């Protein structure tokens, strides 16, 4: 399906000046869609206040927050991962859950004791393949919701800290998108 902006001044710009290129992030979402699996993606975004400070010699790597297991983020996600209803869904429908933490949260994956029906995404797995192969996503505020919506797949929100998330302690702020 080709989508484009119609209000470009055609007397100034023509087909030679404008290329219809698409958006690579979304273009790849329709490749290999026949590999659909009975899986649900779990992807929760990071929290600036709990990821630890940047290392002094490296502004792309953070110190580990050794109090991570005391955060509401860890406690609520860990409880969610071990929820009996989630386990029942996995067993009843033979569903696999794929957990893909935000890159800033990957160092904390080791703190979670994931049940056997939740698999962490492998380091060599391409994100668009996981999206294509998943029936739906459960997320909090991650933009991954747009990838699933683009494919007309269900998005389920689990937002346990919405007020705290948007109170100015994180890099996100409320925008045009209404989660409610």
Where are these regions (language model features)?
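Conserved catalytic-core segment of nucleotide-activated headgroup transferases in glycan assembly
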Residues: 19, 24-111
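Short, acidic/turn-prone active-site loops that include or flank metal/cofactor-
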Residues: 23-25, 122-126, 160-164
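Short, charged, surface-exposed secondary-structure boundary motifs
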Residues: 29-31, 127-133, 166-173
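A short acidic (Asp/Glu
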Residues: 3-7, 29-33, 52-53, 109-112, ...
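Active-site-proximal region of nucleotide-activated glycan assembly enzymes
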Residues: 1-27
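Catalytic binding pocket for nucleotide-activated donors in carbohydrate/polymer assembly enzymes
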Residues: 15, 111-117, 143-180
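Donor nucleotide-activated moiety binding/catalytic core segment of transferases
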Residues: 98, 103-146, 151
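Short, well-ordered beta-strand core segments
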Residues: 1, 137-138, 155
